[in-house]
Amino acid sequence: MHIKEICLEGFKSYATRTVVSGFDPHFNAITGLNGSGKSNILDSICFVLGITNLQQVRAANLQELVYKQGQAGITKATVSVTFDNSERHRSPLGYEEHPEITVTRQIVVGGRNKYLINGKLAQPSQVQNLFHSVQLNVNNPHFLIMQGRITKVLNMKPPEILSMLEEAAGTRMYENKKEAALKTLEKKQTKVDEINKLLDHEILPALEKLRKEKSQYMQWANGNAELDRLRRFCIAFEYVQAEKIRDNAVLGVGEMKAKLGKIDAETEKTQEEIQEFEKQIKALTQAKEASMGGEVKTLSEKVDSLAQEMTRESSKLNNKEDTLLGEKENVEKIVHSIEDLKKSVKERAAAVKKSEEGAADLKQRFQELSTTLEECEKEHQGVLAGKSSGDEEKCLEDQLRDAKIAVGTAGTELKQLKTKIEHCEKELKERKSQLMSKLEEAIEVENELGARKNDVEHVKKALESIPYNEGQMEALEKDRGAELEVVQRLEDKVRGLSAQLANFQFTYSDPVRNFDRSKVKGVVAKLIKVKDRSSMTALEVTAGGKLYDVVVDSEDTGKQLLQNGALRRRVTIIPLNKIQSYVVQPRVQQATARLVGKDNAELALSLVGYSDELKNAMEYVFGSTFVCKTTDVAKEVAFNRDIRTPSVTLEGDIFQPSGLLTGGSRKGGGDRLRKLHDLAEAESELQGHQKRLADVESQIKELQPLQMKFTDVYAQLELKTYDLSLFLKRAEQNEHHKLGEAVKKLEEELEEAKSQIKEKELAYKNCFDAVSKLENSIKDHDKNREGRLKDLEKNIKTIKAQMQAASKDLKSHENEKEKLVMEEEAMKQEQSSLESHLTSLETQISTLTSEVDEQRAKVDALQKIHDESLAELKLIHAKMKECDTQISGFVTDQEKCLQKLSDMKLERKKLENEVVRMETDHKDCSVKVDKLVEKHTWIASEKQLFGKGGTDYDFESCDPYVAREKLEKLQSDQSGLEKRVNKKVMAMFEKAEDEYNALISKKNTIENDKSKITKVIEELDEKKKETLKVTWVKVNQDFGSIFSTLLPGTMAKLEPPEDGNFLDGLEVRVAFGKVWKQSLSELSGGQRSLLALSLILALLLFKPAPLYILDEVDAALDLSHTQNIGRMIRAHFPHSQFIVVSLKEGMFNNANVLFRTKFVDGVSTVQRTVTKQTK
């Protein structure tokens, strides 16, 4: 099959319909200037063959294949290729009867792409199958040799060359089919997995469940009969046992009483043996003390002597230590004295200040005395002037005149008041007479007024009976508003802190239904209460990541949470029942307290509060570390030989016994625990306010009905009160009321006048007495004048004396002030002297310390000798113990007798209790037998079978106690089974089993298919290997022949890489003459192009295609090589059609038909020339 004609219309540069006909069946060449459209003819052939990689036809999309991309009015591109199909043995499958085959492909801009085969529409797959059947696969075009492909072949690696060989052999298509088969296998495996998943997750669990339900159903059905049998068996045994105990109780009581008598006799005998042992022990003890006492005494005296000497030396040591201690105490006293002097200096300074203030007070006292003196002198001058006192402005005669005027005025007012009383009494009498005439009207008004007042009082009592005070609800609502505001503020604070501490929130879903959440205690950080806020940084560093651990009651709870708790983050869980905690040993804690002081290093565990149930978890987190106040203390605790325990300072620095130190900047140290502490306080405060808010809400709710009732009654009270006030106003307008008011007013005026008359009479009497007194004073003034003057002069003298004393005190204060200043200076000098003495004492303490150390060494030596002697004394005591062995034997025998006596007493008590028990059992069992016979009527008819072998009541072959346990268990099981048993389980189980068998059958079928496909793939792999080997041999032979034709005097071959076989890849080797080149880099560019072209043509020759297209493959070759290509094509490809694009005459002159392209007026044209006549 070869091309006869190509028709192009609107394709690339061929705008108008252009028919290229007369193709030679063997060798055709196309030439022309660059851009004239020669390669477009090759592109049109590829276009018809169905190419999908448009880069090989130099286009980005199909629209670019249309002339000027549809911009010149041409909107479609059509290419038709006519093939000569006269050779039927080379025809495509299914087209053997067609002498010609015309394949057309058309694309429309923005439209669809269509194919036609012999004028009929065809699918792209049909076109591909047509060309594939004659080795024309345009999407893997080994028949299309472009100049770029030559270069590409030169750069190929061995596996890529092998891939070209596979393509030539046709095994590449097998690989594609193999991949499809493997995908099919994968799909079948997916199906098998789905079946397995269905079996594992649905069918098998359901089948297993139904199998269990079936077993339960059968167990329940069979258990009912067994339950009845066991119940009768146990009742029969209970009856027999009760009869047996009843009958044996009578005999047992007599036997027990006989045993009691025997025990009493044995007890008396044992007591005699105990007394005998006591005598022997006493005799042996006296003999031991007599024989060994002297030696012990000597050694004891030696030990005592050493102890006394050691005491003397220890005394000296204590004296020196006391002296040293005394000197140290003196130092402390001096230090305290210095401190006291400093304090006294401050006190003297304060006293000076106080003295100055006292002087100011004395100055004020002196001023006050001066003022008093002035007043006395003034009064003295007044007496001299004839006044009663110094303050009076008038003399006694003027005062007498004024008093007489006052007597006259008081007498006039008294007369007027008596006249008014007479008038009021007269008018009151008249008004009362008029009032009596209006009495009936007054009684009627009074009755109605009383009724209205009673109504008001009744409503008031009803109001007072309501347990509600006016304004109480408003106060509660005010409290509610205040509490609500506080609660909202605290809730905002809690939310803010909770958001900042989100990592401490542990949220989970219940892992099982009805899960007890109290088993989950919470995060460690939220379970502790820090006792001292200053230790928060140290505690946070001590705990580290354990602060985020979650505490639960057991490992089962932890496992449930991890597996089914839907946890949002990774957590570490501490189960209280399994956690291995470690706490620093008490002796280490005591050693630490002795070394650095109890307050300087504390166990971290003691600094936190927690619930007792959390003890194990808290010991695990905080039990192994000390918290120290300073770095020096922390070092001492960590590195001391007797302690060696991790320690943390308050600033968060860590000291490990291994020598590892961790510290430095710690931004926000303890911040998390502080925030947690603040959060706990806020939550506690929030709960308190929420409780108070709830209480207020509750009170409001309780008071609402009372408030409503109070409001209603209060409204009634206001209404009644208003009604009463209106009535009172009306009553005030009637005649009787007016007369009553007038009488009342007159009575008040009369009463007031009567009370005033007494006052006026008293005032008149006082004025009269004052006149008399003044008259007497004037008479006595001359007599007393001299006395008063003397008294005043005496006072003046006294005040002057006091002023002198105050002046003296003032001077004394000034002197005291100077004295205090001098004392202050003296104290400062004494302080300086004490500081010098302190320095000398510190030197003396250093000397005494050395002497104490020497004396301590001496005491230690004596202690060693004393300890050795004491050890020897103890050895002698040990020997004395051996002497005690015999005594111990007697003591042991005595103790055995005592124990025997105790046992017999206990046995006697048991026997007495047993007698009581048997008598009780006899009575109880008699009642029990009667009740059993009465309750179970079948006992009377089957009683004779109880306990007989071979019957249902054989108590020997079947243990009654085991039967009782079986009965109880069976009753429990049957009760549970009856609730759970599924009555339809038999039919459901059969249906589920059928589904299971069907799926297993389907699965087996699929797995058999998989096995067959795998086997076929293995067989085809072997055939592929054989085919590739044959292909390699044939292509290798043609490769060498073609290359030697193109480049005479050379050889070429394909061989596997070193240390490999041909399936690992093939590489090209070249020889010039008989010398094989080590590398292709030794070849020139033209030689390498010929070598690549030879390989390509050799591959094509293995399975020749009907058509080959070469596009300027001779571009890099000189003229002689180009001519050789033409000759090679004629020699090696006699049955294939070649279409070659070339610009060199050496190439296209060898062609039978030459097509020349030109570019005229923007459109390509083609001219055919026959260069040689085909034979």
Curated annotation (Swiss-Prot):
Q: Does the keyword Cell cycle apply?
A: yes
Which SUPFAM superfamilies does the entry mention?
P-loop containing nucleoside triphosphate hydrolases (SSF52540), Smc hinge domain (SSF75553)
Which SMART domains has this protein been placed in? SMC_hinge (SM00968)
Zinc-hook domain location is 2-1161
* Pfam families cross-referenced by the UniProt entry: SMC_hinge (PF06470), SMC_N (PF02463)
Provide the SMC hinge domain boundaries.
518-638
PANTHER family (UniProt xref): STRUCTURAL MAINTENANCE OF CHROMOSOMES PROTEIN 3
| Role according to the record | Central component of the condensin complex, a complex required for conversion of interphase chromatin into mitotic-like condense chromosomes. The condensin complex probably introduces positive supercoils into relaxed DNA in the presence of type I topoisomerases and converts nicked DNA into positive knotted forms in the presence of type II topoisomerases. Also involved in chromosome segregation in meiosis.
Quaternary state and interactors: Forms a heterodimer with SMC4. Component of the condensin complex, which contains the SMC2 and SMC4 heterodimer, and three non SMC subunits that probably regulate the complex: CAPH, CAPD2 and CAPG.
What the record says about family reads: Belongs to the SMC family. SMC2 subfamily.
What this protein is called in its record is Structural maintenance of chromosomes protein 2-1
Q: Which organism is it from?
A: Arabidopsis thaliana
For this protein's source organism, the top of the classification is: Eukaryota, Viridiplantae, Streptophyta, Embryophyta, Tracheophyta
Name the encoding gene, please: SMC2-1
